[in-house]
Amino acid sequence: MSEPTLSVIVPAWNEEKYIARAIESLKRAATVYERERGATAEIIVVDNNSTDRTAAIARECGARVVFEPVNNIGKARNSGAKAARGKYLAFCDADNQVTENLLVLIHDHLENPKIVGGGTWIEPERRNLKISFFYFIWHLYVAFSRVGVGMMHCRKADFESLGGFDESIYAAEDVQLAYDLKRIGKPRGQKFELVRDGWIITSTRKIDQTPLWVMLKKLVGFGFGLQKKIRSKTYCEHWYDKAAR
């Protein structure tokens, strides 16, 4: 079996409710990718010390599973990247689904020498007033910053040169990596760009269970890089709370 070109890394902590649909979505996209580009993608699920059936379900669905015992999202992503065999990396959350063309678009992005990496637009799986308002603010931030962290992707060589995700922070590690990629890409004439015509669909579980003002406060904090805050697991406990799953 030939080595995969693209490795999709899915960090997962107690995600038995969502992991199967995420993997099946990625498998459909991988089928299109192989047909359209003649390349293969591997799906790596990082079991981040789950206490439920996350790892077993992932294996049943055909994903590679690696274990990371320390509950830290950056560390989990890095463990997946270390196990990856592809020259291109993409990171997908366990409660996400992808459009069937997305892996093709990511491949084309990373084949372009003028692009250092990128992300995608994020669409919620359903909408109400609260959800729509949150994503209106989020999309404004993405439009002005040009830092979209949905399905973030880059070349493995660049990822390794940067040391991967910062394991000293408990949230917004993907935002930090995006800015790091922009920094190394700029002198090389490369841009960090969002993929067009493909996106991810995400669950609304955390917005459903969290007051809007709390979500917006944390979004502003992460967006403006409050380094002291994102290094506090207590401040970021919203992302590590079993009740939100």
Q: What residue spans do the PLM features occupy?
A:
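Short aromatic/hydrophobic "clamp" motif used to bind/position activated sugar donors
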Residues: L89
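Acidic donor-binding/catalytic loop of UDP-sugar-dependent glycosyltransferases
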Residues: R53, C92-D108, Y179
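Short, well-formed alpha-helical segments that are part of the catalytic scaffolds
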Residues: E15-R35
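Cell-envelope/extracellular polymer assembly enzymes that use nucleotide-activated donors
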Residues: T5-S7, E42, Q176
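Conserved donor NDP-sugar-binding/catalytic core segment of glycosyltransferases
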Residues: E100-K130
